[in-house]
Amino acid sequence: MTIKSDKWIRRMAASHNMIEPFAPDQVRVSEDGRKIVSYGTSSYGYDIRCADEFKIFTNINSTIVDPKNFDEKSFVDFKGDVCIIPPNSFALARTVEYFRIPRSVLTVCLGKSTYARCGIIVNVTPFEPEWEGHVTLEFSNTTPLPAKIYANEGVAQVLFFESDEICETSYADRGGKYQGQHGVTLPKT
């Protein structure tokens, strides 16, 4: 597998709608002139943005977290430009971008250092061959203080790896449960 460059990312976004909406270069300043956490195409990856839809974890209903039988009451829905994650808690969000991953490609996503240096960890599982949808983002606040997440700004970087051989069965072929997801998607079994 080889990592793909900015040229390949731009070409695939233009010819295959791999990323929509797409920023062909790094964006570091908002349209109104404010400094922001960067997003867009980088040398060997794409910095994704967080949309303004969040699900903030709460223990108000005193449920047990069970990935096989997840209780939606474990989250409080929030929409806004800034999400405050309580100390030692987490939140879910989704990307602004919608992805269509080619059959020969697998991605790995890593949190941006701007957030990591503040104790905020971004977790995203790989985007598998022929998966498509908005990406559900997991933010963990590892600090004893409330932490801010900024909507419509960069939060993580996606690295694209292309195999020298096409996979036998893609995510779409096996009817993956998160195929075509829109919005913040909770666990499914």
Swiss-Prot record:
Gene3D superfamilies: 2.70.40.10. SUPFAM superfamilies: dUTPase-like. It holds the Pfam family DCD. The keyword Metal-binding does not apply. It catalyses: dCTP + H2O + H(+) = dUTP + NH4(+). GO terms for biological process: dUMP biosynthetic process; dUTP biosynthetic process; nucleobase-containing small molecule interconversion. Pathway: Pyrimidine metabolism; dUMP biosynthesis; dUMP from dCTP (dUTP route): step 1/2. Its EC number is 3.5.4.13. DCTP binds at K112, S113, T114, Y115, A116, R117, T136, L137, E138, Q157, Y171, Q181. It comes from the Bacteria. InterPro entries: dCTP_deaminase, dUTPase-like_sf, dUTPase_trimeric. One of its GO terms (molecular function) is dCTP deaminase activity. The active site is at E138 (proton donor/acceptor). Keywords: Hydrolase, Nucleotide metabolism, Nucleotide-binding. Catalyzes the deamination of dCTP to dUTP. Homotrimer. Belongs to the dCTP deaminase family. NCBIfam families: dCTP_deam. This is dCTP deaminase. It comes from Paraburkholderia phytofirmans (strain DSM 17436 / LMG 22146 / PsJN) (Burkholderia phytofirmans).
